[in-house]
Amino acid sequence: MPTINQLVRKGRQKKVFKSKSPALNKGYNSFKKEQTNVSSPQKRGVCTRVGTMTPKKPNSALRKYARVRLTNGIEVTAYIPGIGHNLQEHSVVLIRGGRVKDLPGVRYHIVRGALDTAGVANRMQGRSKYGAKKPKAAKK
């Protein structure tokens, strides 16, 4: 336990907060050609690579991912949620934060139904998370 005098001399050290999605906290000023500290909920980017990867130990699957170069110049790995996708190299996508627990290094999700990414076809429940439109009512 510190004395009052020790606290006056040194003070308490501030806890540093480390972001879980650091690429969303950086902007880019193309006029000055420098990085800026502008946080945003989503960012646009271009796919440089689309592929599959296998998850960590107890799980087994082929998870779809895309390597995305963001508008701020940072390149990140993003997960493609849902069944089936239409992404390929040079597709323009929107990414949001949110890691995939069983894929190391994947800290971002691609937003389905935004920009070049199509929504999941034939999805009836949880449609808003996958960019699926409401199905037309059946005619009698």
Swiss-Prot record:
One of its GO terms (molecular function) is tRNA binding. GO terms for biological process: translation. It comes from the Bacteria. It holds the Pfam family Ribosom_S12_S23. SUPFAM superfamilies: Nucleic acid-binding proteins. The modification 3-methylthioaspartic acid is found at residue 102. Part of the 30S ribosomal subunit. Contacts proteins S8 and S17. May interact with IF1 in the 30S initiation complex. This is Small ribosomal subunit protein uS12. It comes from Geobacillus thermodenitrificans (strain NG80-2). The lineage of its organism: Bacteria, Bacillati, Bacillota, Bacilli, Bacillales.
